[in-house]
Amino acid sequence: MDANTNPIELCGTVAAVIYQNEENGYTVLKLDVDDGSQTMVVGCIPYAVPGESMIVTGSWMTHPAHGQQFKAEFAERTMPETADAIYAYLAGRAVRGIGPATASLLVSRFGSDTLNVLEYEPEKLTAIKGISLSKAKAMSANFRRQAGMRRLIEFLASANIRPVIALRMYQYYGDEALQLVQDNPYILVSDAIGATFQEADALALGHGFDDQSAERVAAATLYELAYNAIRGHCFISYRNLLAATSQLSGVPDELVAQSVDTLVESGELVRERVAGCDGCYLARLHEAEAYTAERLLAMAQNEYRRMPNTERIAAQIEAQLGLTFAEQQKETLRLACQHQVIAITGGPGTGKTTSIRAILALFDVLKLDTQLAAPTGRAAKRMSELTGRSAQTIHRLLEAGMSDDHQDIAFRRDEDDPLECDAVILDECSMVDISLMCALLRAMRPECRLILVGDADQLPSVGPGNVFSDIIRSGVIPTVRLTEIFRQAAGSSIVAYAHAINRGEHPNLAQNSGDFFFLRRTDPQKAADTVVELCKTRLPNNMKIPPSDIQVLTPTRKYDTGMAALNVRLQAALNPQADGKKERRFGEIIFREGDRVMQIRNDYDIVLKNPDGTTAGTGVYNGDVGQITAIDPQTETLSVCYDGKTATYGFEMLNELEHAWVMTVHKSQGSEYRAVVLCIGRAGPMLLTRSVLYTAITRAKSLLIVVGDEGVAYHMIDNQAQTRRYSGLRARLCGECGEA
């Protein structure tokens, strides 16, 4: 049956729960429909249990592996009323501490009144042999907790608010959640809960809230600022904030202006003139930006007057490394000797790594304890391999963890407990957002040196800000621009094409070479077929490159040539089903032993084990790539090996993982791969840009194969569209900020 655009309702009783994620409520269940049929239902239905009745609203869909399913958008649930239904409900372990045996005793004693006794008169349960008062209270508390969750879901469902929002609300506020959201539905828009303003607004207006209330306008204002922060902006202009909030909420600009004033007074919002713009910040982003600028300015003004003989030291380092430095690299050494903070930017093959190695050797001569760092695990690993020194992610360096309320990140290293080093060399700086740069600077002692290295022409950070570009454009921080392509890289078509594309030139894609090939495929399905062939047979057989050394990149997650569809194809080709190979389904994804997977959110608490079983540390970070080594249905765990260290995930944690044979260009930043297959086709206009193509090409070390339409490639080269990022760091460094 084809999906219908009109919502469909199915009424029935839960026959079995196949899968349930306790964190996000995603559920797969069998529903005995009232018409006598049985169907598989998927969706966010927290705490679903066999025996309960529900009305699910949604549409039919066909899963490529599991066939026809009903995708539920909402579920209206009713508590069982008859003794038989109550027994089925409790025997299905709906309430922690109650199984089939206890359920039978309860229903035999209290019949259809069992649930009322559980919730309101738990002391009566002690009349049953084996149930103590403490056990009765525990069972009652568990039932009330679930009942409270159900009431919250039902209350929010009145405004068609997603069940996952109810789940987050209850996890965060507990038994107070329903009362809090009834008092102020706009609490749902907070970062911790993550509802859209439209969801909270529908609930509030539906329950009699004034459409011009101060709470409503404040929520809309903060939502607009948070929405823009997700899109990379540190601030937006006052005028744009008034217009956007007015459009979102439907209230006059004057009321929004009053709300801004109130939020400024409360400290939740900061209004300041930035480079001639009347800007409005979320307080946390303003603090991060202001501190970063203040600290960098202080460091930039610190010059070392007692200069060593850099010419002599450079010659000594050249002999040590077996290299001859170009003049630009000697300049990096001179600046690193003279200044507390410097920036180095350059494209592929221009000697950034050589400059890092040279400065590292220089700091050794100066007897400075130097720490190497990068934004991602893959970038840190590459930095270690190229320098022969240990490098860490910024998060691991700063000993990241969760805050006391478990809703935000916290760093153990800060002003009160700074890093015990004399210098930090930070690579891949274009990936660092304003909050992370602020955290690093807070953790550095006042005298600690900082070397910032990166390629300012690559994509900016995913998080707010344009830190590396702002630092370089300010002209305040001593900067070296590496432009000379060295002999080893000069013969590479990958390097030549990258620089040509960065200049806006159209290379001859038909002119294939030893390390670059273009395969023209204008049909998306044929392009996808070609990608699979390259990874499965052509590169392993013809060029002796194993699939483990091949990374497929694409600008987008969607469409036939996007990340999601290609990962399904490559899993089937490179790691198919086999006897003895265990699997675990999670939503629409099947995880299988042997799969290549990526961590997609920071997990600061997960434990890493060495092969001998000893603890290697804690924390797996967004972008880390590993391989599934074991799936254990008995313990409901899945193990992933990351560079020889194994992390074990409970099945409820699998929303932290996704397949990684294919990744988006954005996710590939900071990494380098022996062979890259870049598939370009249909994508959103802001993904088909020169910076995306340039970033993708510069990920390839030895071989680059582009599959797709040359028209799309040339369009990307010509498309310099960059969504302007409202970031005030450059203006602060240049002294262009003041009161609004």
Where are these regions (language model features)?
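Accessory, non-ATPase domains that flank or precede helicase/AAA+ motor cores in DNA-metabolism machines
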Residues: 1-308
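Loop/turn positions that initiate beta-strands
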Residues: 51-53, 594, 623
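Pre-Walker A segment
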Residues: 273-348, 354, 360
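Short hydrophobic/aromatic beta-strand immediately N-terminal to the Walker A/P-loop
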Residues: 342-345, 451, 551-553
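Conserved helicase motor core of SF1/SF2 NTP-dependent helicases
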Residues: 358, 362-368, 374-386, 395-403, ...
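Conserved helicase motor core of P-loop NTPases
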Residues: 456-618, 629
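C-terminal accessory regions
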Residues: 503, 611-614, 622-740
